[in-house]
């Protein structure tokens, strides 16, 4: 049976993006899409999706080391600079089942992307399009149709409720948005 890319990625979640090459022996920079280093550091086998060539491959990591805000990674079978260049910009995926179980007040980015956002009065503000990591706290990017985006800091003062079951988030709008 032939499966579509959507079907192949159904139970998988993006975990990192491959950046520029590093050195001459096929190493690449790996930029995590999670703030959980233990998930990245435990990776052994990943699904590599390259948008340019529309290919999904399985990659086995044989070496990884931490650098300045990213990792240097070496895959089996990628041994030259030219080999590595083919994977620049690729996204790494893992099975959702391999992610650590979170407490009820924690979430993975993929769980909140697309959620509906309402203010305290029940007015629909839009959907979560993106989660930005700022270092001090995450920020939800909310879009409704083509109007301006709303940025909400992910702190208790502004994010009042995240209900994964009903796909709904309730926020208090910051004063500067009034």
UniProtKB/Swiss-Prot annotation:
An annotated GO cellular component of this protein is:
cytoplasm
User: Has UniProt tagged this entry with the keyword Cytoplasm?
Assistant: yes
Molecular function terms from GO: ribosome binding
**Which SUPFAM superfamilies does the UniProt entry name for this protein?**
PRC-barrel domain, Translation proteins
Q: Which Pfam families match?
A: PRC_RimM, RimM
Which keywords does the record carry?
Chaperone, Cytoplasm, Ribosome biogenesis, rRNA processing
Q: Cite the InterPro entries for this sequence.
A: PRC_barrel-like_sf (IPR011033), PRC_RimM (IPR056792), RimM (IPR011961), RimM_N (IPR002676), RimM_N_sf (IPR036976), Transl_B-barrel_sf (IPR009000)
Question: What's a GO biological-process term for it?
Answer: ribosomal small subunit biogenesis
Domain PRC barrel per the UniProt entry, residue ranges: 104-177
Q: Which domain of life is it from?
A: Bacteria
The record, for Gene3D superfamilies, names: PRC-barrel domain, RimM
The answer to whether UniProt assigns keyword rRNA processing to this entry is: yes
| Location in or out of the cell | Cytoplasm
Q: What subunit structure does UniProt give?
A: Binds ribosomal protein uS19.
Record remark: domains: The PRC barrel domain binds ribosomal protein uS19.
Tell me, in a sentence or two, what this protein's role is. Answer: An accessory protein needed during the final step in the assembly of 30S ribosomal subunit, possibly for assembly of the head region. Essential for efficient processing of 16S rRNA. May be needed both before and after RbfA during the maturation of 16S rRNA. It has affinity for free ribosomal 30S subunits but not for 70S ribosomes.
Name the protein family: Belongs to the RimM family.
- NCBIfam families per record: 16S_RimM
Q: What is this protein called?
A: Ribosome maturation factor RimM
For this protein's source organism, the top of the classification is: Bacteria, Thermotogati, Thermotogota, Thermotogae, Thermotogales
Could you tell me the gene encoding this protein?
rimM
């Amino acid at each position: 049976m032939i499966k579509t890319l959507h079907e192949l990625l159904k139970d998988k979640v993006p975990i990192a993006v491959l950046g520029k090459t590093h050195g001459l022996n096929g190493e690449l920079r790996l930029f995590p899409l999670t703030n959980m280093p233990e998930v990245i550091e435990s990776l052994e086998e990943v699904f590599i999706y390259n948008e340019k060539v529309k290919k999904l491959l399985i990659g086995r990591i044989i070496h990884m080391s931490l650098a300045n805000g990213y990792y240097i990674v070496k895959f089996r079978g990628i041994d030259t600079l030219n080999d590595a260049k083919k994977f620049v910009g690729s996204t790494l995926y893992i099975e959702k089942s391999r992610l650590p179980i979170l407490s009820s007040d924690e979430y993975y980015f993929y769980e909140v992307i697309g959620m509906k956002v309402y203010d305290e009065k029940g007015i629909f503000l839009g959907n979560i399009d993106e989660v930005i990591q700022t270092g001090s706290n995450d920020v939800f990017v909310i879009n409704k149709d083509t109007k301006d985006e709303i940025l909400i800091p992910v702190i208790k003062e502004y994010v009042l409720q995240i209900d994964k079951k009903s796909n709904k988030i309730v926020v208090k709008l910051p004063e500067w948005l009034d």
